């Protein structure tokens, strides 16, 4: 069962209902409005514009091209439609958290 839900715009933690982040066109913002990253085509860039990952539709790869996670594994942690926005939410807001089953 997924720990988070993503409706295409907002990432919400299921257990508490807390809004963690949102997508505003191609900009990823945390709940307090701070910019965390940007979606640019198939690439994910951090708040400084550095490429940190890419998503080819099936898997997220780091900036060196090494596979980090597949979309199926992301969907086990975040409930939502598969796509670039879901992958970006996982990469920036869920990947490093210790409170979910998808910890890598």
Model feature map: region roles:
Residues 1-20, 24-26, 34, 41-42, ...:
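Long terminal segments
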